[in-house]
Amino acid sequence: MRRVGCVLDVESVLDPAVFDLVSNKTNGGYNRSTLQRSVCASVLAFSEEEPHGDLEVLGIQTFHLGLLSEVELLAAIDTCLPDPADKGSRLVTYNGRAHDMVVLRQRAERLWLFGLHRLRGWDVERDRHVDLIYHYGQHSQRRASLADVAALLGTSIRTLACSPNIAASARARDWDPVVRRNQVDVAATFLAYGHARAWQRGCARPAASAWTSLADWALALKERSSHLGDFSHHQRVDHARARLAASMGGREPCGCGGEGG
């Protein structure tokens, strides 16, 4: 069986038009989703094969306000998401339930985009929306950041993305650093999903295939997208290839027993 899913990551900044209308301007509107507007989003499409849980990157699409209006950006995201009515589909985010999906829903409401049926469907779907912040921080008082999780798995996403100030870059309409940050985040979330699935299944193949697939996909982009190309020669890739080969060759026990997860 082949399950199709996507990883979604959204960058948002303060919307001055909304902020001007509120009386409580504490902290300049920081960390208040209703005052934010979406400025960039990346969707990483992937497949997940059963019975072993092998993951494969199918592609990354990125949309931003340098090329699209916000109405067009939201419509493009809606088109790229898998159909929530498909019981085999899956949406993966990092803090998506509290931020990404909330911002997208609220902006769609503000812009009268009530017909975005995939966004609406995933907004209410809980079982197949995998928000990894709960996997990596469910027992701690403070949720782990995506940068912390990436460091746990062996990579510095802020180094890869050159740690831009998203709000300042968006105001200056300097979209390259925003896109770079967004794409690195969505790739890191995909790797985190691979490790989470490997733990859930008791088998290294989801993690190993996530690393190798992302590396192979990014290798072709290295000349024009070095921030993603860096994933192709990461020190963990050789280890992932060896673990994947051992599992496929029957040299490494698989705790999932070939059962779907």
Task: Locate predicted features.
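DEDD superfamily 3′-5′ metal-dependent exonuclease/proofreading module
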Residues: 1-261
